[in-house]
């Protein structure tokens, strides 16, 4: 899900090179003759098709969420695990269908376009809900930055450990602290945070997509190889047995597994941005509905394979993060490639999620203190080899670095990949994937209160709220249990 970059870049590139036509981001659009190269909102003609949209969605979905799926299925077992995944995919499919009707406010063919998820909420549901949606979305982005810091440091350590195991022939347990690796990742992100519009560099999304497919495919392949070597499918129908874990742990872990699976499917936020790259006619929503069906089918099959093979390979001992659980020591170079791919992917994906927060903070501050020199003054520094000087703004430098330091410190305080992923999945799933799309659809299509359709939509929403709450509680309980055993800043693996 980290590769939302793909969608973003595509969108930004519509108008970054063509500042002249960037009228749509303001409120007025001069009347224009129907040129062949522009759309009805004065932006350059969109060229996306069902296939480009599907590709964007697939790259936006398949990401670090894959890594915890085997663990999630291990908590739920062979019956409930795949069933829950199927359920999430169906809910996501349905809510994506509702969302695709919200790209244009009012009329599906000629209504005003909404360029992002937040635009749609603002224009359909109004100011108050827009603020709440923003709060949840920025919290989610902040949480993802923390989750990615943890995941990246775990993968860096995994490379170090696998080489250490290899050297000592498996005799040395190779315990180490994750802190130095989090700090290295943090320093890299502080530097990248200073690059303006980093999330709009076109090749980032391609790199992210290639990397996530690399490590997902390696994880899948190693799972299949391990199953073949074992000669049996491990695991049980009801998941991890009581005895291995206590009764209460089993309940918490089951709840947390729901959050982990929800996280793997949480990408509805980028759907409208992807829809904004699609050409019309036919109506964008039609193309998008096809694309959603294709991409959700592909990702669900892929997730089922990764999760099931991981569980079949390790049974109840399935690691929380498939590639770093050390179920595989050999071929160690292949594991290193997979973990390096994760790190490269997360370094870029961190920025894709952090930059919108930066943009939001900068905009809010500029509106509040328009005349403050400290906030707006830029110093130019000439960098040898670069044509244009680099502009330094003290405020930007200070608070962006502060943001990265905050996420790094929180990661060191609670470096539990699964728990954090579960919390994020729970936080984002109900409001962003279900509640807002349902509310927007009801408002858009003027669904009558207490009509059958209205009641069904509200029941779906309430059911998903319950799942979100349960997953959140389970994950928070997981953090509490982990913190009993773990001393902050002293984590070892």
From Swiss-Prot:
Keywords: Amino-acid transport, Cell membrane, Membrane, Symport, Transmembrane, Transmembrane helix, Transport. One of its GO terms (molecular function) is symporter activity. Highly expressed in developing pods. Found in the vascular strands of siliques, cotyledons, leaves and roots, in the inner phloem of stems, and in the funiculi. Lower levels of expression in flowers. Not expressed in seeds. Inhibited by diethylpyrocarbonate (DEPC). It is found in: Cell membrane. Residues 160-175, 222-253, 315-340, 418-419, 480-493 are extracellular. InterPro entries: AA_transpt_TM. Residues 1-49, 92-138, 197-200, 275-293, 362-396, 441-458 are cytoplasmic. The keyword Transport applies. Amino acid-proton symporter. Stereospecific transporter with a broad specificity for histidine, arginine, glutamate and neutral amino acids, favoring small amino acids such as alanine, asparagine and glutamine. Also accepts large aromatic residues such as phenlalanine or tyrosine. Has a much higher affinity for basic amino acids as compared with AAP1. May function in xylem-to-phloem transfer and in uptake of amino acids assimilated in the green silique tissue. This is Amino acid permease 2.
